[in-house]
């Protein structure tokens, strides 16, 4: 019997689910914290845990598997260099899911998904760099 072996379809086609989870995993690796709905958070956990385990393996085949999953070489480099080193001594349990109330528009339950022992400065790093670059460009123009 296959009782309890299912997964959430989340009202999406298989290809849409696969793309959504790839994008969510990439965002989580980049920012180390994301806010999403609780069912999506519970579904993304095993995907990201397996990616971190691939990063800890560190061989070429694992790197290619990670690239095929999240499709961003820059994030795969972060996964294999930064995150793999951070969790070298931890056997699983790299992700924390915390309930975060309800969304205003449709009252959907929200959750914060973050890496355990995350780098707090990683969240918003790209935005800070973009704002600093714009400020420098304005200063040069003036």
Curated annotation (Swiss-Prot):
Gene Ontology, cellular component aspect: cytosolic large ribosomal subunit
Taxonomic lineage from the root: Bacteria, Pseudomonadati, Pseudomonadota, Alphaproteobacteria, Hyphomicrobiales
Domain of life the protein comes from: Bacteria
Gene: rplQ
PROSITE patterns linked to this entry: RIBOSOMAL_L17
Family named by the database record: Belongs to the bacterial ribosomal protein bL17 family.
Full protein name: Large ribosomal subunit protein bL17
Organism, as annotated: Brucella abortus (strain 2308)
MF terms in GO: structural constituent of ribosome
Record's subunit section: Part of the 50S ribosomal subunit. Contacts protein L32.
């Amino acid at each position: 019997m296959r009782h309890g072996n299912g997964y959430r379809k989340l009202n999406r086609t298989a290809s849409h689910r696969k793309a959504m989870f790839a994008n969510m995993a990439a965002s989580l690796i980049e920012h180390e914290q994301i806010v999403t709905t609780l069912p999506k958070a519970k579904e993304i956990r095993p995907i990201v845990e397996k990616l971190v385990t691939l990063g800890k393996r560190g061989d070429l085949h694992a790197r290619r598997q990670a690239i095929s999953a999240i499709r961003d070489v820059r994030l795969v480099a972060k996964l294999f260099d930064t995150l793999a080193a951070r969790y070298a001594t931890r056997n699983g349990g790299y992700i924390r899911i915390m309930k975060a109330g309800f969304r205003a528009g449709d009252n959907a339950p929200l959750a914060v998904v973050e890496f355990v022992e995350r780098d707090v400065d990683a969240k918003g790093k790209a935005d800070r760099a973009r704002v600093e670059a714009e400020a420098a460009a304005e200063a040069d123009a003036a």
